[in-house]
Amino acid sequence: MSILSFLLGEKKKSASVAKERLQLIIAHERVGGRPPADYLPALQKELVAVISKYVHISNDDIRVSLERQDDLEVLEVKIEIPQA
């Protein structure tokens, strides 16, 4: 980190913010040991909002799911992007 960026502050990119949020959600769920919270619809809505800035998609074009198998959790995001 340079001194100039430290003094002026540096804006985080939306991708890194989204990545941090996903990591926090998954870590929280692992520690809790309980069934997944109902954050998936909100996560899906936020993803649609971010992707819509660049490509026209609807809520039906994205699927978010969380699966648990033994001690492994898989967050799966499927996005259908229309042909240009």
UniProtKB/Swiss-Prot annotation:
Which Gene Ontology BP annotations are present? cell division; regulation of division septum assembly
Which InterPro entries does this one have?
Answer: MinE, MinE_sf
Q: Which UniProt keywords apply?
A: Cell cycle, Cell division
Domain of life, per UniProt, equals Bacteria
Disulfide bonding pattern of the chain: none
Q: Per its UniProt record, what Gene3D superfamilies does this chain match?
A: Cell division topological specificity factor MinE
The residue stretches assigned to a coiled coil in this entry are none
Q: What does this protein do?
A: Prevents the cell division inhibition by proteins MinC and MinD at internal division sites while permitting inhibition at polar sites. This ensures cell division at the proper site by restricting the formation of a division septum at the midpoint of the long axis of the cell.
The entry assigns this protein to a family as follows: Belongs to the MinE family.
Q: What is this protein called?
A: Cell division topological specificity factor
Origin species:
Burkholderia cenocepacia (strain ATCC BAA-245 / DSM 16553 / LMG 16656 / NCTC 13227 / J2315 / CF5610) (Burkholderia cepacia (strain J2315))
| Gene symbol of the encoding locus | minE
